[in-house]
Every structure is written in C-alpha cells, then in structure tokens.
C-alpha cells in the first residue's frame, strides 16, 4: 500500500489510502456570481501596501465592492488603518467580504497572466480566482470574518 518513485538523487514515497476520494467539486461555490476583473499587478501592489498595516496574526483585508470600485481596508490592533480605492471592472451586487491578505498575494504570485478575475458568490462563500485566458486553472480562497 505504498507508492515510491526513485530518481538519481531523489526518492518520493507516499502511502496509498484506502477509502473514497473526497468530492472536491463541493468546494466550488454555485449561484449567481459577481465578477471583478483587474490587472494582476494593480491588485498585487494595492494588497502589498495594505499588508503593511494588516493585523500580524490574522492578516485580514476587507473588500468593499460596488459598481466599478474596489475599496481595500486593513487595520491592526494599534488602530492604524490602510485604505485604498481602486477603479475596477465589477459586475454584480454591492458586496463586503474579508480575506487573509497573505493567501491572496500567494495566489496572485502564482498567476502568470497580466489580468485576473475574482468571482464572488456572497460574503460567506468562497471566492474563485482565475486567469481569463486559462479556464483550466482556478484558485479557491475562503473568506474570513473581519
């Protein structure tokens, strides 16, 4: 019940698990989506600036989305506040949702495209991040309460 691969100076081993593989598709939200389209670098830079003042333990950032506008807010226990408003292409109902800023930056660092889409299904549902030109890769980020 083990699987092993050996290369010249590398060995990879894993234990095979008996059981049913979890239904990963349940992680993907469904419903009426709201979509944010933005240049990856524009969002990365804004999140990097906000991360300076985010809470070191929870690293939260709040997204306040409305027609063609994204307001990013991060704060810390010292009552310092970072706030930035970005002009974006947003289609959907107004929405406020929080995320771990580190997770967002990690995903954006993995995306190769210059543009990204963030698809929201409500404040309590996960967010899908994808490259518009590459439908086969999607990233799922769970929201956090702020």
What role is predicted for each listed range?
Residues 27-30:
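Short hinge/gating elements
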